[in-house]
A protein has these predicted regions:
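An acidic- and aromatic-residue-enriched active-site/binding cleft used to recognize and process polar
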Residues: 117, 142, 174-176
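S-adenosyl-L-methionine-dependent methyltransferase catalytic module, highlighting the catalytic core
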Residues: 23-31, 150-159, 164-252
Length: 252
């Protein structure tokens, strides 16, 4: 397609149509039977590699990563978590997950509220000061955010405050440190030295992360990719992902 014709097509078709067309083209280009992305429903020859070189990592259609696909697997198994008349918060919403989660909420009459500190088309939601009443949120998904917050314990307490008595918060963080203690940083220099990223404040040990969640008032169930059927793990290209399923530990 010539540059002139491409520019005319962009003028004639709405952005949403163009995005949908590009997605369908990617789906056709990468179609196969070996893998499946449960975030966008695409059947794939392979997932794309991570920039670090790790193979079969990124969905070429929607951009989902293994942690997202583990969370979707859990949510698709636990349809009862989507409550008619309730509300779901999606913190720092991943573009690849938003359409599927919005549809799952819409099907049961549940409000879907995507938001964070940044992000086009999302509410401004600060995990330290959520604009919701106590016990008013029924479901929350928050991936790789708490490890980037200077005061993660305050954020955990705020999440606990807004969760309904029967609510569920899925709070994922990246791969756990295998040493004795969580790696915690307080300065930019420390963050760059430890993680090569000024936005990351810590790398938890699994035990410490669970302890912090429990101290904030949650019952914690650990949902591990390695416990799933091997065929599903292979199709979704899950690694050693872990999902912490958090529910309020008694009334406030």
């Amino acid at each position: 397609m010539s540059g002139w014709l491409r520019s005319r097509v962009r003028q004639w078709l709405p952005d949403a149509w163009m995005a949908a067309m590009r997605k369908q083209l990617r789906r056709a280009r990468h179609w196969g039977l070996r893998h499946w992305c449960n975030a966008c429903g695409s059947r794939l020859r392979a997932f794309l590699p991570h920039p670090s070189g790790e193979q079969d990592f990124l969905c070429p259609v929607c951009g989902s990563k293994p942690p997202h696909r583990l969370a979707m697997y859990f949510l698709q198994e636990r349809a009862e978590l989507f409550v008619g008349g309730g509300q779901m918060l999606h913190i720092a919403p991943e573009p690849g997950l938003r359409p599927r989660l919005a549809t799952m909420c819409e099907q049961v009459g549940m409000a879907y509220r995507p938001g964070g500190l940044t992000g086009e088309g999302a509410e401004h939601l600060d995990l330290l000061d959520l604009p919701f009443a106590d016990a008013s949120v029924d479901l929350m998904y928050c991936c790789h955010v708490l490890n980037c917050m200077p005061d993660d314990r305050a954020a955990m307490r705020e999440v606990r405050r807004v969760m309904s008595r029967q609510g569920t918060a899925l709070l994922q963080v990246p791969a756990f440190h295998v040493g004795a203690e969580t790696i915690e940083t307080t300065t930019r220099e420390q963050r760059i030295a430890a993680f090569n990223d000024d936005g990351i404040h810590r790398c938890y040990t699994d035990a410490d992360y669970q302890q912090r969640l429990r101290a904030s008032g949650f019952l914690v169930t650990v949902y591990r990719a390695e416990a799933l059927p091997p065929g599903d793990v292979a199709r979704l290209s899950l690694k050693r992902e872990v999902l912490h399923v958090c529910q309020p530990d008694g009334p406030r």
